[in-house]
Swiss-Prot record:
Protein name: Isopentenyl-diphosphate Delta-isomerase
Source species of the chain: Escherichia coli O1:K1 / APEC
Gene name per UniProt: idi
Protein family (similarity comment): Belongs to the IPP isomerase type 1 family.
TM regions (residue ranges): none
Gene3D superfamilies documented for this protein: Nucleoside Triphosphate Pyrophosphohydrolase
Pathway: Isoprenoid biosynthesis; dimethylallyl diphosphate biosynthesis; dimethylallyl diphosphate from isopentenyl diphosphate: step 1/1
Length: 182
């Protein structure tokens, strides 16, 4: 995969430039555009992934299915599809927006900051996973209700963005719709 960049944003969310992704994530990370996606299988189960230990921010942490950064000229939905192929080796249904105005700032134990405008999506797949070990070290298909109970009981065991997304009432409602079999 070619070098990725983040799209830098001003306080109003207007693009101001780009920066190489690895260089962008520091103790003083500038506000930038990202996305987060929750992926469900044909049984209505959620894919929870554990970030590879080589990840700069939150290595080894359990999180939602896939996250990333749209590239210049790429829609958020196109970016979700691209990252699902790259990280998980799967084709997905068109991503659906479940929390369009999510924005957060969090600092990991190593001092790396995430500072993102991060629309949240959900999608389905019927493909078999082909995990990219550079991105994901472990994964589990889980019942959404069990994951939400785990987040409520032990939020420290999950990425902060996953916790913040999952504790939003409207996002929970929209995620629950993906557990219904089609």
């Amino acid at each position: 995969m070619q070098t990725e960049h983040v799209i830098l944003l001003n306080a109003q969310g207007v693009p101001t430039g780009t920066l190489e992704k690895y260089a962008a994530h520091t103790a003083d990370t500038l506000l930038h555009l990202a996305f987060s996606s929750w992926l469900f299988n044909a049984k209505g189960q959620l894919l929870v992934t554990r970030r590879a230990l080589s990840k700069k921010a939150w290595p080894g942490v359990w999180t939602n299915s896939v996250c990333g950064h749209p590239q210049l000229g790429e829609s958020n939905e196109e970016a979700v599809i691209r990252r699902c192929r790259y990280e998980l080796g799967v084709e997905i249904t068109p991503p659906e927006s479940i929390y369009p105005d999510f924005r957060y700032r969090a600092t990991d134990p190593n001092g790396i900051v995430e500072n993102e405008v991060c629309p949240v999506f959900a999608a389905r797949t019927t493909s078999a996973l082909q995990i990219n070990d550079d991105e994901v070290m472990d994964y589990q298909w889980c019942d959404l209700a069990a994951v939400l109970r785990g987040i409520d009981a032990t939020p420290w065991a999950f990425s902060p963005w996953m916790v913040m997304q999952a504790t939003n009432r409207e996002a929970r409602k929209r995620l629950s719709a993906f557990t219904q079999l089609k």
